[in-house]
């Protein structure tokens, strides 16, 4: 898949940022999410993971189990936190080394799946 590139929209073909990719997928299928907030990228760039986690927790609510187009946060190596989105019964992520890849549910079994609150 596309390489990891901070702040890139996957539609441009140069790379993908996990947060922007999740928003793009949710847009394409008509699933609710809040408007994109550049502050999330600024916090990630500054490695302010606790603040980013707090925004995530405030904007989302847990779902009882993994469901199509639910989202999750995960540890992403040197890049701190990453966002994954459930697509076709697996999780699409942007790995800091491997780029965009689809993972089977067992690879993300420790994740808490959430959806954006309206």
Regions found by a protein language model. Name each.
Residues 1-57, 68, 75-77, 81:
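N-terminal capping segments
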Residues 60-66:
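Short, surface-exposed secondary-structure edge patches
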Residues 76-118:
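Aromatic- and glycine-rich peptidoglycan recognition patches
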């Amino acid at each position: 898949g596309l390489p990891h590139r901070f702040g890139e929209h996957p539609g441009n073909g140069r790379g993908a940022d996990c947060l922007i990719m999740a928003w793009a997928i949710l847009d394409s299928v008509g699933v609710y999410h809040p408007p994109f907030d550049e502050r999330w990228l600024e916090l990630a760039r500054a490695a302010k993971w606790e603040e980013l986690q707090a925004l995530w927790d405030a904007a989302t609510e847990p779902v009882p189990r993994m469901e199509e187009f639910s989202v999750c946060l995960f540890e992403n190596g040197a890049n701190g936190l990453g966002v994954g989105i459930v697509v076709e019964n697996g999780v699409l992520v942007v790995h800091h080394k491997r780029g965009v890849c689809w993972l089977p549910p067992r690879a993300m079994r420790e994740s808490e799946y959430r959806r954006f609150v309206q």
